[in-house]
Amino acid sequence: MDDIFDQLRSGVWLDGFDPAFGEVLAECAEKCFYLNATPPSKKAEREAIIRGLFGHIGSKFVVHSPFRCDFGFNIHIGDNFIGNFNLAILDEAEVKIGDNVFIGPNTTLCTIIHATDATRRNAGIMQAKPISIGDNVWIASNVVVLPGVCIGEGVVVGAGSVVTKDVAPHTIVAGNPAKVIRKI
């Protein structure tokens, strides 16, 4: 089973209908269900679920419900993290998030790419590319970050943006597709 996940992380095109994916997706969906059903007042329980779900998460973090991810183990988050409600991380490839990162509501980090050819897409052919987010980043609400994107340190991503390309450190970007507004 590890072999197919290693291949997926390496960026090769694979059969997304492979039963190994289905098992992991179902297990992760179960963990997300329990996280989302656990009240905010049960902080220790929520923390334990999150630590069991993610590959790594540092100290001082808040993940508001509802939250959703695909595998969980490909998510690596630093210290002092806030993930607001309706955060979705489609982590077929690694998602690395630095320290002091705030992500607004209704944001999606998507590592998965489906084939553009309908025949291949309908057969489940997919590829994944990692996402990297540096330290001290604020991603406002309703943002989509696409596969393979690297967001540099100190970046601010404006509300409603679709980030399709790498973002240089210490810049503000906004729009669809996201474009540099100014340096910080």
Features from the language model and the residues they span:
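Terminal amphipathic alpha-helical/low-complexity segments used for targeting or macromolecular assembly
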Residues: 1-60, 178-181
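Flexible, glycine/small-residue-enriched loop-and-beta-strand segment within the central core
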Residues: 40, 67-77, 82-150, 176-178, ...
